[in-house]
Amino acid sequence: MSFLQDLFSKPFPSDKAPEVERLIEELVKIGKTDDFLTERRGTPGFNHQMRHNRARQIGARLDEIGGMALMEYTQRQVKRKTTKAISEHLEYCWDEVGKWRA
């Protein structure tokens, strides 16, 4: 999807917009401060697969709200607000959340 499509055609109900926007901003913050992956086992806030726990919880909630379309939209938003590398880490972090496959 292009930037304009994302701007004018949101993959979530309008009544969920505040929650979705808050969750996206939280993911951006996680990406910039903690990253979505870690290289060290046992890092607080990360699971045994070294994926960020809260980011996975957010992914599950986004899946409940708007499914794969919303998760893809969110990844594009994270990429626009951070870097390609960070968005790729999110892609792997979300593996097996809903229908998401890295």
Regions found by a protein language model. Give the residues of each.
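Short intrinsically disordered terminal tails
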Residues: 1-3, 7-8, 98-102
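Short, charge/polar-rich alpha-helical segments
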Residues: 3-28, 39-40
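Amphipathic coiled-coil alpha-helices
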Residues: 23, 30, 37, 51-54, ...
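Charged, low-complexity interaction regions
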Residues: 32-48, 68
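Short, charged, amphipathic alpha-helical segments
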Residues: 42-56, 72-80
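Short, solvent-exposed, charged loop/turn and helix-capping segments
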Residues: 65-73
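Amphipathic alpha-helical binding modules
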Residues: 73-102
